[in-house]
């Protein structure tokens, strides 16, 4: 391929990603997995009173992929065949027991297939080396599958079983299945199928995101099979995966979908690190905005797709990509979440550290704006990686990719980048000089080994893999520039690269992608493979000619002997321009990031005297420089300038209106006071201050910055008081906090307008957080509040008694909604990634039920609001609902509600009737049960690593029925 062809191919790959990145369901290119497909095939549903296998196409996929020996595919590792065969055997057995609508296969044929599958699995288990297995979660998945098969009457004995159970015990020693009930994202959510019989699936529903559990079809299938209520959203998710994932309607599903972040940042980081100019590529801005928004929304730590739980790999590579795209972001949240004493962890409870994850964290630090700030962490990662190489005698085995060349490639890139920073004084040398020397020696050994490993046809890998060959070529292109490389080895490297590129350029019937990537089973991805191949071909094309004098290295790229860096590899200028975006040179060397590329145009061109906040762009005082479509200041918040006019800005024309008949006056403080009169009156009356205390208590865990916390406290106070103004009007209340309600003083219309006005003032306060997610949270919460209030008014005005469940749903929207708004805003501003909303909703329900009880029984309430105000308002509160539904044939209480009585005698009669139905005793029992559940949740959070929270316990204790 010519350089232009390579650039066009890279742009086409970016376009492929960008066209789908805004799909609300996400995208993914992971290959179909027999294992997950088998689990989805086992979902049944009752339709028109008939049990039906819901996804018959998945079962057909399983049948069509059974091998002659009775087993299923071993993509690249023996664990693939074990998991694929175990899950498929389980599916076959269950379809044999319950054929339902499946008529495409006879019982005899199915029985024969089961026998062959059983024999194949026994053979696989007998030959399995358990200790050599690295795949994610195998230690809990295989034992679980063996138990499920035993339940179906199929048992297996094999020599490695005892060792397998030891590893399972070790894995689960720090984990209890009940952790899944907590509002904390744990990796076990990706494998709920391993916990059938060990958990109540109804209690994990709060972890569902867009119809899936940690984007896993098999985990989602297990939930659908064992939850007591059918979930249409999960069904819709799986139908979408079957139709739109890599199986393309064949019935096959991947081990994860979507994987939008992972399969965006891996190709982009691969292309950007080798110098592809993607800033002008179609759709790059969509991807950059998507990634930056995800980074902000998830507070600096991300997973393979939004809101599935963060990992160091995806976090580091997203940060790397954003920095290379001139959207600088901080690494601080990543370090806080994943840094350990001697290495960086991928997830919170991983059994063994990942080599590649530590490489990616290291690369993110090395490409950060100021790598010198993270010298200690850089050295920590280097020490860990170097030790992994030396201890294993270069036999490094990673848990996410099966190819040794993948780990070597990442290490080579890291060493090259580290050396470049040290040579340019951007980073100090390592304190341990022996490691510094060892790294260069290591790179020399890696290069020598890679050259020797090349196959006669120019490929690398056991299967003549194009993707592995790309890894190897990339390694050699970095090693080529090493000063320590002898001329003889440099020549051999050049020949190996040329032969490798010839192999990569061959058009064959074989797919370029390879089964190298590790999930529950091994998978391949066409976009990952294409990115590595394009990267290898570009790095190779950028090598100097054989006859050129060896050149110094700038940012890992030879200047090919030219003294000035405006010529790279003999080519004058970049992109055919002398001045790009107002800078005088276009050598592609970014003074902030020092990207290893030859044709980037977004840097400071190495001018240290240019302020960092402009990234080298200099604007004239009275004229706007032409930007050629690139972004000023290097951020996606700036709008491209075309012909001197911002595409995103309107053109304002000054017109003199001094003689106009009407000129709008400024809004005055006196006018503001008129609108806020009812609000200020109610604010002046002392209340319980419960919400402010709740915020402070949760901040023990969330540790929100003071400036943000002050805004949130103000917003919640404003919104609470404004909603009370409206509530008092709609409930026709007389007293509020022992004083006349605001609308009895200011009038109904003025009080209502004041309440609505403050809703918008509160929204303006939320905007001060400068967090797009906070705006969405606020708007969604207002919608919930009005939904809750609307249903309560409907029941009252239509005299329809809701069920207890309907009432609690209303409370979750109304009272709980305001509680949740406070904590959701705090979570949006915090760095800790724990979902406290289930606990907050529980506290909101407890608070409201207690309030309902005290409204009818407390003398303090009588003083503040009148005796049994809920009866006077005709309101269906929790004890009233129970009493009415305890004896539906007795209409006395509902008729009293209809009258909205003000007479104390009638109210006392209603209370005595409610005593006769044991409604107050029932309410006390419900509160006790809910408070126990809340305490258990709080203790679970604390046991899971959060500090003891006395404040929340005090708030819970205050939610009392004591009169």
From Swiss-Prot:
CDD domains in alphabetical order: Trans_IPPS_HT (cd00685)
Residues noted as binding Mg(2+) 2 in the record, renumbered to the chain: 311, 314
E.C. number(s) listed in UniProt: 5.5.1.12, 2.5.1.29
Span(s) of short sequence motif DDXXD 1: 727-731
Ranges spanned by the short sequence motif NSE/DTE, renumbered to the chain: 333-341
Motif window: DXDD: 311-314
InterPro entries referenced in this protein's UniProt entry, alphabetically: Isoprenoid_synthase_dom_sf, Polyprenyl_synt, Polyprenyl_synt_CS, Terpenoid_cyclase/PrenylTrfase
Keywords from the named record: Isomerase, Isoprene biosynthesis, Magnesium, Metal-binding, Multifunctional enzyme, Transferase
Family under the similarity heading: In the N-terminal section; belongs to the terpene synthase family.
UniProt remark on domains: The bifunctional copalyl diphosphate synthase is composed of an N-terminal type II terpene cyclase (TC) catalytic domain and a C-terminal prenyltransferase (PT) catalytic domain which are separated by a linker region.
Protein name: Copalyl diphosphate synthase
Organism: Talaromyces verruculosus
